[in-house]
Amino acid sequence: GLLLVSNAWSATLVVANKAEASVSLIDLDDGRVAATLATGDGPHEVDVSADGRFALVTNYGSGGQSGNSLTLIDVVNAGVVKTIDLGEYKAPHGVEWVDDGRAAVTVEDNQALVVVDIEKGEIVQAIGTDQQVSHMVALDPDGRRAYTANIGSGSISVLNLASGERVRNVVTGNGAEGVAVSSLGHVWVTNRAADTVTVLDGETYTTLKEIASPGFPIRAAATPKGQVLVTRARAGELVVYDAGTFSEIRTVAFDIDSLGAEGRLFGDRFGDSSVPIGVIVDETGEHAYVAHANADVITEVDLSSGDVVRLLRAGREPDGMAYSALSPRRD
């Protein structure tokens, strides 16, 4: 049998390189790229299975051409297992593993969320959001409900994965893009065009707090230590919030220069910002990883101090990332 050994120094950062149709596996022991693997066009997001073994990548498409596939990657063996064809379901973006065998994926062109059986490589459920640009997805802790952030409608959709039904759509603010479920079960939504963050009760979906968050708040990630992280693309910042009090603990201002805007998704819209978008945390909740789409770099941030402890490099226009506690084999 295969012995999977995990220690504090062995882990992998899986990075989707949007402009390169590839994924980089960064060995966090030494910070180097262990492997670069080909995906479909426009790999925008990636999520790792609970055991850390497999990464699932959404191939969103590029150049105005919507993709309709997922790439399954074996993290330990550093190889592509297979490509899953989504058929009529196009522009897959947000992705979360529901359990060992299934994953939930937003499909923007269809205004829906699909649940995919990974082994069979087929869609087993499709739930309509009836909203514009269903972009990111988060699951509640027991995996029974999914929340999609719908940029074009400024809302989230609450979807019951057990029944396959939409529970409701909740308007949060213009440009609702990032979504995360905190350790307290609250649903945090970043409204990029409104420059706000909305915190919703996870049972009633009433607004607990609306937080002013200027600078294009674009992604959210929850930590196991009771914090919620928000990246602000225009401001070039990472904000750390207290999940319980909703107060700001600190803002990390990144001093990283843009490499230039040509050919990049947001172009020169944010001036000299490095355009921090993707943000994830390690399993301890002590470190965050932030992808800077206009600087082709990932910052590792110590959340206790707010210090950037190292710079990691993957491919061109990194954005979606996932963390695995397993490390890739070296040949």
Locations of regions flagged by a protein language model:
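Predominantly soluble domains enriched in secretory-pathway, periplasmic, or organellar proteins
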Residues: 3-331
